[in-house]
Amino acid sequence: MAVSESVDFEPDVAEYIEEAFERCGLIVATGYDLKTARRSLNLLFADWANRGLNRWTIEQVSLPLVTNIANYPAGILTMTVGASGSFTVGETITGGTSGATASITSVTSSTVIAITIPSGTFVAAETITGGTSSATTTVTAAVDFTNVRSTIDILSAVIRQNAGASTQSDTSISRISRDTYINIPSKRTTARPSQFYVDRQITPILKLWGTPDATTYTLVFDRLVRIDDADNPQNTVDVPCRFYPCLAAGLAYYISLKKAPNRVQLLKAVYEEEFERAAAEDRDRASLTLTPSRDYYTLIR
């Protein structure tokens, strides 16, 4: 008998819910069954973020740095305006109605500017004014924080100089703790950044030290982001095939907590086994080289 020659098995949310209910000895009978299962699935994704590194959720972000600005969003944060051409990079903008302020880190198009985390909340239709250029324009849509808030953590970062040129070079920068950062006595020292601290707020912030002393730097970092939500039963899930068994087992366990308490222990054991197997496979396979020490030593008798 011929094989299918297809490798596109990709269950949607509804199929995972049906599988989970069947493992609980149940069937999906009502609309509320779908709702409660979808909620459990999103909570399961949140649990995976706490359990460790999910490599398919790593993405790279590049942020142009601005002289004398040390704090940046841990992702892409933009504002859509009527016209951006008269504003200058590095200047502070102020909302005429809200009084909110932010600094411009780049002008990405004729109607979009990238900004730092605002102090206050800009509102749609208000007028913003540039502190240096005195340019004015209208905010056409509220600032969307979704991209920045999807950041779970920062894994590594480099400072790139002369991006795109033949002389492009990357210099790694080290991550420091909150305690180390707060004890830096001269946070406004200008230099090429050599360290960063991740302030893990709901809207996470990257704090650099030293404060950039030129506009030729680009901050390039790898970040761990949230798995896409399971919103619609017809949606597929943002999970690679190697995690399909783990997802089905985990959802069955979560549903059993509410609807099949007699199966909780069994389904939990299956889920933990499936997760351990999937996590072990989802690892970095870089070569490891061990070099014996050549240090001299003295044998004491």
Show the residue positions of the predicted features.
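Autoprocessing Asn-cyclization modules and mimics
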Residues: G52-V143
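Glycine-enriched, solvent-exposed interface loops adjoining structured elements
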Residues: M1-I76, T138-R301
